[in-house]
Structure formats: structure tokens, C-alpha cells
Amino acid sequence: MERTCLAVILAAGDSTRMKSSKSKVLHPVAGRPMIAHVVEAVASAGISSVALVVGRDAEEVAKAASIDGVGIESYLQKDRLGTGHAVLAARDAIAKGYDDILVTYGDVPLQTDAPLKAARQGLADGSDIVVIGFHSDRPTGYGRLLVKDGELIAIREEKDATDAERTVTWCNSGLMAINGRKALDLLSRIGNSNAKGEFYLTDLVEIARSLGGRVTAVDAPEIEMTGCNNRAELAVIERFWQERRRREMMLAGVTMIAPETVFLSYDTIIGQDALIEPNVVFGPGAVIDSGAVIHAFSHIEGAHVSEGATVGPFGRLRPGADLANGAKVGNFCEVKNGRIGEGAKVNHLTYIGDAVVGAGSNIGAGTITCNYDGVNKSETVIGENAFIGSNSSLVAPVTIGDGAYVGSGSVITADVPADALALGRARQEIKPERAKLLRERALAIKAAKRAKA
């Protein structure tokens, strides 16, 4: 029978060091609140449910933690009396009787499921407590994990450690797995006879051992256990997340010419043999199919780029943009809620918003779909194999038929039938010698101003 598991995520801190008007767990990593990364990690570890311990910004934190397929209940920690007290805020959830209890933190967004699964396996193998640790070249400030004969005998805080114990490099991450059938009994035994009068979760090690229980530890990469307390640490976490995800993509067949300049979102999907040039930013909701090319300095969010399509350089795709196979959106072009048909070209200095561009059509430089009247958005439909001349304005709602031509500089306010030529501009006039007269008049005005000065 599969073991049941409750994940208790502690996210009730005051976040004072973040210097922010909102809880630190709401700050994004790769375009997603860090608390959501934590929920995803515990979900991948096979948990049955999540108990989210909240304090500041409780409603916002609970909303940010919500991801599909994961049952979450929130529990308010009114007073901040230590980690042991925080876990007991979820007493009602723990009392439901799970095999395993995983305790983790909402400000550790780089954690993965591997050490969480290892901790759960430790419980399955007979441990009552499994602490997740990490080895560090700079252990100063961390509690040390002291192990003897394969069991964890103590977590020694820096200030209490002997000189010999300070040489230990295996450190306490704070993450822990607890035998769910014994959890409430163990947690209720934590006291607060310390200088701060707080209830420390780490006391469970000695409590469990004093009752004859087995306590062990498992290892995790140090970077995955990194907590986020300020903006500098947030930047470090963002950098590592990006490095890890870029490497995964490149090993899966994506070419990145200068990967350190490419920034991905938590849900970015890029297919095999796609080419990503330098200085490209992907916001949430970007899907890039196999063989697509994203040229330098492009920004893509909420958009789909099909096989063989190209974007940029300096292209921007906003939510709802959808490029069909072989479509091109070139330099200094923006597409928002627009479908660009197969082989269609939008090559220069163009805005396509709330529009459909048919297959094989060519949109000239400087073309604007005028989709907003100050109140409502309207749609522009351009048929297949149409040609829109440069510097044209298409005032929506309007339809340009298949094979139609729009002359350069036109302002189109009415539908254009298929294969028709539309001209929406004033007729050119030539006035001989008029430029000379205008120039002479301007020079005379200038001279008069100088004479008065």
C-alpha cells in the first residue's frame, strides 16, 4: 500500500529582511511566486495533501500557493513562537493520520523532490525523524549534523558547538520528515526553555532518541536548500534557477548561443532544434516549437511560435500571439492577441493587435492595426496572400480580403474585397517653385527675429 504523506509548508514569517510591502514568499522566481515552486516540489514527492502555515498576507499567500491537482488547506499562526510552534499550527491536519509528515519552508524555492523522496524513504525504512542536510564549504552559522553509527545523534547550533564539532561540514537545512503516526506526540513534547522562549523543531532529534526512536539524515545539494531572506539572496536564487533550467533545455536539444543572457519563465517550453539567440526574455506562457528561431533582444510571453517560424531581432510577442509554421515577425514588431498564418511576413516596425493575418500575406513596414477606440477592442482580419503597403493604418473592425492590395500610406476604414486594390490617402500634388517661396519666407522671419534681438 502506498504511504500517505502530509506536507507542512511554513510560510508565516514576517519577511522583515526583504524590505517589502508583501510577504517574501510572494516574490517571484522565474515569473512565479516562490511559494508555488515549493508546492510543486512537494507535489512531485508524492504527497497526499498540503498544510500551509500562514501569517502575513495570508489570503494572498494561499492563493499564490494554489496549483492544479494539489489539495491545500491553510492554517494561521497568530504568534511567531518558533518552528515547532509553527508546525503545530497545522495540528488538525496532522491529526488526520498520515504515514509521513514532510516539513519544509515557503522561502526555499530551489528545492527538488529528490531529497524529499529520500527523507520519506528513510521513514519507510524505520526512522522516526529524517533530517535533510547539506554539505557546505562555509558552514559557519549553520547547525551541524552530528552522526554516529549511521544515526543522527544531535543538531548542534554554532554557538553551542565545540571546536571539533565546528569542523563538521554537514549542516541542517531545516527541512525534516516525521513519522506521521507519532508526529503529534513528538511535537507536543517540544519545550521552550531557552533564551528566546521559542519552540524549536530541531529539538525533535533529542526527543525522538530519548524515546528510543531512530533518527537519521539524508543529503541534498546546498544550493537547493538556499533560503531567501533579502533581495540579494533572491537574485542568487533566480540566477541558479535560470542556469539549471537552461542546462536542462540545452541537453534536450535546444541551441542557446549565449545561454547566460537568456531568461526563462517557470513554464517556458522550447522544442528540440529551436535556436535562441542572445538577450531573449521569455515571460509566462511561452511555447516555442521545434526548429523555430528567436533572434536577439526579443521578448515573448503568453505566445506560441510554431515550427520554422522566426521572431526578431527586437521582436515582441504578447499574450495571445500565435505564429504558424514558417511565419516571420521581424525587427521592432509587436503582436498581441494576433494569429500570423503560415508563411506570412510581418517584417518591420509593425503592430498587429487583435488581428488575424492569413497565410502567405505580407505586412509592410510601419503598418498598424488600430484596434482600440478608447473603450473597446475590435478585430482586423487580413486574408490569405494579401499585401499591405508600408505605413498603412487598418482601423478595426475591418476585413481585408484574400489577395487584396492596400497601397502604401493608406488609412483603411472599410472592408476591402478579395483581389481589390484599396487606396486611402490624399492624391499627390506638385506645386512648382512653392518650396523655394516657403524657404525664402522662413529665412525672412528668422532674419526679422534676429534684428529685434
UniProtKB/Swiss-Prot annotation:
Catalysed reactions, as listed in the record? alpha-D-glucosamine 1-phosphate + acetyl-CoA = N-acetyl-alpha-D-glucosamine 1-phosphate + CoA + H(+); N-acetyl-alpha-D-glucosamine 1-phosphate + UTP + H(+) = UDP-N-acetyl-alpha-D-glucosamine + diphosphate
Per its UniProt entry, what is the enzyme's top EC class, as one word? transferase
Top-rank taxon: Bacteria
Q: How is the cofactor bound?
A: Binds 1 Mg(2+) ion per subunit.
Q: What is its EC number?
A: 2.7.7.23, 2.3.1.157
One function term, GO molecular function aspect: UDP-N-acetylglucosamine diphosphorylase activity
Pathway the protein acts in? Nucleotide-sugar biosynthesis; UDP-N-acetyl-alpha-D-glucosamine biosynthesis; N-acetyl-alpha-D-glucosamine 1-phosphate from alpha-D-glucosamine 6-phosphate (route II): step 2/2; Nucleotide-sugar biosynthesis; UDP-N-acetyl-alpha-D-glucosamine biosynthesis; UDP-N-acetyl-alpha-D-glucosamine from N-acetyl-alpha-D-glucosamine 1-phosphate: step 1/1; Bacterial outer membrane biogenesis; LPS lipid A biosynthesis
Which residue ranges are recorded for the region named N-acetyltransferase?
A: 253-453
Keyword annotations = Acyltransferase, Cell shape, Cell wall biogenesis/degradation, Cytoplasm, Magnesium, Metal-binding, Multifunctional enzyme, Nucleotidyltransferase, Peptidoglycan synthesis, Repeat, Transferase
Key word Cell wall biogenesis/degradation present in the record? Answer: yes
GO biological processes: cell morphogenesis; cell wall organization; lipid A biosynthetic process; peptidoglycan biosynthetic process; regulation of cell shape; UDP-N-acetylglucosamine biosynthetic process
Gene3D superfamilies xrefs: Hexapeptide repeat proteins, Spore Coat Polysaccharide Biosynthesis Protein SpsA, Chain A
* Region of interest called Linker, as start-end residue ranges on this chain: 232-252
Its protein name is: Bifunctional protein GlmU
